[in-house]
Each structure stands twice: as structure tokens, then as C-alpha cells.
């Protein structure tokens, strides 16, 4: 009976040691998320562990800024698409950028022109103007009742700030954390 007791206490000590080891290992947090960048064909271009200090590249920022301009300056024929574009644009602005969008929307209400007018935006270039701003050039084609009414060339300087998303909602809406903080656009003449 004495041997059985020694074996039971030995198993109890072994079990306690293994439980302590599992607890220690679970607190280490060894799961590392990986980021896989793919091209338009679905082939892996870059594979690396995710970093909380990731800084987006200029082409990545340019893509999001081009989409921002298309969302704000374009005028589709569908009110739902227009609303979704504006809400998506607000996801890419700081408070100052949102105030600039509000001023633009108040003076040029896009919902008032909905119906007979559509505006197609074609981005021609997005280049870095300084460490905190990008210059975007685009062409707007305005259609009235389905007929081309005007073609205008526009440029903008967008000042940006890059902030790492801190919660799941911001990560889903703006994964790179690129925010427009100032907007200055104008029509080109000539």
C-alpha cells in the first residue's frame, strides 16, 4: 500500500508540474500573425510576420487616397452608392479632415444633384508632395441626362497622418491607418 501511495503522490507532483509548465507556456503568447501580400493574379509577393510598427508604402497610400477622391468627388446615379462612398471617405479622415468634408458637402450638396447628373472621376496621378502630403491629379467627366456635359481637370493636395489602428472596427475600415487631415483642391484652367 505504501508503494501505491508514493506512486499517487508522484503522479500528483508530475501532474502539478505539467500544469505549471502549460500555464507558463500559454502566457508566452507565441502565436505570430503573418501578412501575405499578393499580386493581381493571386501570387504571393511578400510574406513577413505582422509588425505593430508597420509603415505603409507610397503606392499603398496612393491607392487609398485615389479611392478617397473617387468617393468624394464622384457622383453615381444611385443614392445608396453615393452614401456608402461618403461614409467610406469619412473613415479615412481625422476630425479636421471631416470638418473640411462637411464644409464641402454643405456648399456642394451631392445628394441635391442626384438623379440627372453623374460625375465620373479618373485619377491620373498620385505623387508625394512632401513628407506629410500627396498631390493628386484627376479628370472629372460630368454627364447630364446621360450626355457628356463637361470635362474638367482637377488637382488636390491632401495632407495625411498615419496612425496604427487600435481597435477591430478601425482595422476593418482603414487597415493601414492612413487619415486625411487637410484637403485643398482646385480646378485646373487652360
Language-model features, listed with the residues they occupy:
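Structured, amphipathic secondary-structure segments that form assembly/contact surfaces
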Residues: 1-12, 22-33, 40-59, 80-190
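Hydrophobic and amphipathic membrane-targeting/association helices
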Residues: 16-18
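Solvent-exposed, amphipathic alpha-helical segments
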Residues: 64-75
Amino acid at each position: 500500500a505504501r508503494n501505491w501511495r508514493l506512486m499517487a503522490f508522484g503522479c500528483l507532483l508530475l501532474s502539478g508540474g505539467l500544469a505549471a509548465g502549460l500555464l507558463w507556456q500559454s502566457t508566452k503568447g507565441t502565436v505570430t500573425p503573418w501578412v501575405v501580400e499578393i499580386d493581381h493574379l493571386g501570387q504571393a509577393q511578400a510574406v513577413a510576420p505582422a509588425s505593430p510598427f508597420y509603415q505603409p508604402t507610397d503606392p499603398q497610400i496612393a491607392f487609398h487616397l485615389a479611392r478617397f477622391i473617387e468617393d468624394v468627388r464622384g457622383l453615381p446615379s444611385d443614392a445608396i452608392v453615393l452614401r456608402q462612398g461618403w461614409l467610406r471617405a469619412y473613415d479615412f479622415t481625422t476630425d479636421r479632415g471631416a470638418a473640411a468634408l462637411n464644409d464641402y458637402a454643405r456648399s456642394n450638396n451631392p445628394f441635391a444633384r442626384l438623379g440627372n447628373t453623374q460625375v465620373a472621376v479618373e485619377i491620373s496621378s498620385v505623387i508625394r508632395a512632401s513628407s506629410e502630403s500627396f498631390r493628386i491629379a484627376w479628370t472629372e467627366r460630368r454627364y447630364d441626362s446621360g450626355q457628356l456635359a463637361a470635362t474638367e481637370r482637377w488637382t488636390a493636395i491632401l495632407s495625411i497622418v498615419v496612425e496604427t489602428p487600435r481597435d477591430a472596427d478601425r482595422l476593418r475600415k482603414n487597415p493601414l491607418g492612413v487619415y486625411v487631415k487637410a484637403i485643398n483642391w482646385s480646378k485646373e484652367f487652360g
